[in-house]
């Protein structure tokens, strides 16, 4: 395997029929303090490195930034070639959304999948707090829509599981 960064390694395909492998083994979104984690931009660069063709994405991530995660989900859903997502550890929070991007979704026997309502922090005025609450509600609806579409569960079942 070729190492790209601390969070991602990839294996080039031996033939056009064999999948390339990307491993997401860190938080989603870059850490503001230490620079660890995977941004949507870095993931896009990695996708370009492996090129078109079948892809396996192995996931062991606690989740992280919703915006980066949704962009990664959309990039994977937009691929022309088949994508298999494989949870090999934990797919928590926004990493669970990325796991649902696969055309085929696999979970290892000793793996975990965790969903919840989005959360965030804000400092400021009461108007700032209301804006944040509205943004969180909007994100919750987007996430619930993906869970509903990709799992076949009802919206009510998904919303209950997220709270």
Briefly describe each language-model feature range.
Residues 1-96, 101-163:
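N-terminal organellar transit peptides
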């Amino acid at each position: 395997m070729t190492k790209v960064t601390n969070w991602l390694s990839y294996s080039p395909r031996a033939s056009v029929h064999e999948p390339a492998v990307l491993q997401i083994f860190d938080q989603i979104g870059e850490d503001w303090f230490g620079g660890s984690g995977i941004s949507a931009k870095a993931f896009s660069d990695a996708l370009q490195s492996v090129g078109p063709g079948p892809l396996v994405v192995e996931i062991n991530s606690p989740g992280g930034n919703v915006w980066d995660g949704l962009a990664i989900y959309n990039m994977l859903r937009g691929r022309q070639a088949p994508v298999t997502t494989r949870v090999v550890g934990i797919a928590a929070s926004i990493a669970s959304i990325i796991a649902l991007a696969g055309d085929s979704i696999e979970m290892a026997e000793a793996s975990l999948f965790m969903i919840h309502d989005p959360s965030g922090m804000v400092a400021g005025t009461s108007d700032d707090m209301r804006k944040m609450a509205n943004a969180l509600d909007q994100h919750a609806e987007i996430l619930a829509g993906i869970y509903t579409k990709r799992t076949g569960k009802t919206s009510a079942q998904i919303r209950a599981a997220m709270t």
